[in-house]
């Protein structure tokens, strides 16, 4: 399918990014980013389930809002700050079909205080990915670098990848 056509592209993209030493300190992290990009791609191409971008401190809001239309066409939605407690278990929202649980939740930053929220998402079958300056145990995929600037660039890179895929899929 379409997903396998992307594999050589993803590897080259990730390797080029790594060679520039922009956000990776090891080939292990490169492999993890490659896995995440493939997971996001497969979710967009093969699933009707949404991807949520959870931006806890609103740092990326302006950037992502510029591309809201393109991202929503492929079921990628900006959630913004953390959702209120009880949101995920509110049957009114989810059982009526008003909202669908995402397939993937992409966190711009995850701290130890958000462990329960991550676990609540995982209990609903959501794959949780996060960018941070250190490894976060509760995440399915913890993408981290040794400094915040590299972590920011990594998050922009992933969002840019989602935008690229949305333009490709919609043509």
Task: Put a short name on every predicted segment.
Residues 1-170:
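Ribosome large-subunit tunnel/peptidyl-transferase-proximal elements
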């Amino acid at each position: 399918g379409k997903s396998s056509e992307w594999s050589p592209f993803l590897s080259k993209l990730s390797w080029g990014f790594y060679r520039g030493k922009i956000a990776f300190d090891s080939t292990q992290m490169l492999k993890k980013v490659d896995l995440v990009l493939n997971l996001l791609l497969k979710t967009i191409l093969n699933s009707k389930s949404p991807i949520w971008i959870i931006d806890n401190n609103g740092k990326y809001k302006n950037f992502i809002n510029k591309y809201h239309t393109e991202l929503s066409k492929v079921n990628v939605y900006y959630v913004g700050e953390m959702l209120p407690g009880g949101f995920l278990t509110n049957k009114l929202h989810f059982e009526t079909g008003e909202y669908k649980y995402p397939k993937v939740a992409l966190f711009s930053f995850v701290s130890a205080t958000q462990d329960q929220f991550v676990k609540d998402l995982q209990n609903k079958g959501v794959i949780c990915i996060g960018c941070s300056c250190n490894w976060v145990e509760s995440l399915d995929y913890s993408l981290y670098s040794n400094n915040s600037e590299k972590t920011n660039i990594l998050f922009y890179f992933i969002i840019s990848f989602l935008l690229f895929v949305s333009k490709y899929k919609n043509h």
